[in-house]
Amino acid sequence: MEDARSYMVSTAPAAEGLFGLLNNYGWRKMRALVDITKSRSREELDTHKEHFSSTDVAREVIAGSILQIAYIAIERYAVPKGKSENARHFESEINRLIRESSKARLKGTFSLPEQFCVGRDIGHLPMGMIVYAGRNQYNHFAEDRLRVLNEVVFNHLHNIWPTPRNGLSFNLYDGKHFHSYSVLAALGWTDSAKELGYLAYKRDLSDVLQIEC
């Protein structure tokens, strides 16, 4: 029977490989840009531009796959310790806004799923909730709108980082884009310069699963 430790061990090769691909992203992007500058015809330029854009899509797919692995780990094996003071305050503020707005999409009580209220706080939300919303945005990209809970998490991230650099964004309403890599950045899992993203990922998940890896 699989437990938290065996899940982490069995998914480690995939997770580490995905982080390795992310670590190479910067070089791939730079090479794609150089190819654009060296284009000798309109046809070559169009091809190189397409390749340049595809590297961004690849980055989002890789990041989304990492979020999926983390999501399953938390959903199945995280050990909740109760909602933090920040999480409870966040819930109360959202419920206040719902009561004060006749146009609120959510008519009932807003509540964060306790299974994902785990890990260190990022702003006023626990790490598990950031994984939750990031994974759902990636997996339900084709839908017109996300559920309220997911949108609220992204709005919170957008309030913390309204104008992040390097092509990152948490704004769900500015065109149709994946935000998987931006979520990894918010989690602190993107240090490709020193290749520390995987170690940060493993440390955070080991903490919420209460295991040593």
Region spans (language model):
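Amphipathic alpha-helical interface segments
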Residues: 1-121, 164-213
